[in-house]
Amino acid sequence: MLKQSIEIINKLGLHARASNKFTQTASQFKSEVWVTKNDSRVNGKSIMGLMMLAAAKGTVIELETDGADEAEAMRALTDLINGYFGEGE
């Protein structure tokens, strides 16, 4: 199991389009993916769960991956977040 804290840096936070990109990326892997904000922990493959976190710009979330391809999943998800979900800012 891998855990990493990461800040949401894109302008609109974890909104619908960003949540969709996150869940699509997470779903490419066999590993379980969990996202935690404060005391709320949701399945990273659930768009509704992610949107319920209401993670705005500047929010620090904790990513957790667990499974055979956990390192690859963590790398892909952190790259997605650090790349502003492909939105440019």
UniProtKB/Swiss-Prot annotation:
The active site is at 15 (pros-phosphohistidine intermediate). Its main location: cytoplasm. It comes from Neisseria meningitidis serogroup B (strain ATCC BAA-335 / MC58). General (non sugar-specific) component of the phosphoenolpyruvate-dependent sugar phosphotransferase system (sugar PTS). This major carbohydrate active-transport system catalyzes the phosphorylation of incoming sugar substrates concomitantly with their translocation across the cell membrane. The phosphoryl group from phosphoenolpyruvate (PEP) is transferred to the phosphoryl carrier protein HPr by enzyme I. Phospho-HPr then transfers it to the PTS EIIA domain. It is found in: Cytoplasm. Phosphorylation on Ser-46 inhibits the phosphoryl transfer from enzyme I to HPr. Gene3D superfamilies: HPr-like. One of its GO terms (biological process) is phosphoenolpyruvate-dependent sugar phosphotransferase system. The gene is ptsH. PANTHER family: PHOSPHOCARRIER PROTEIN HPR, PHOSPHOCARRIER PROTEIN NPR. Keywords: Cytoplasm, Phosphoprotein, Phosphotransferase system, Sugar transport, Transport. The modification Phosphoserine is found at residue 46. This is Phosphocarrier protein HPr.
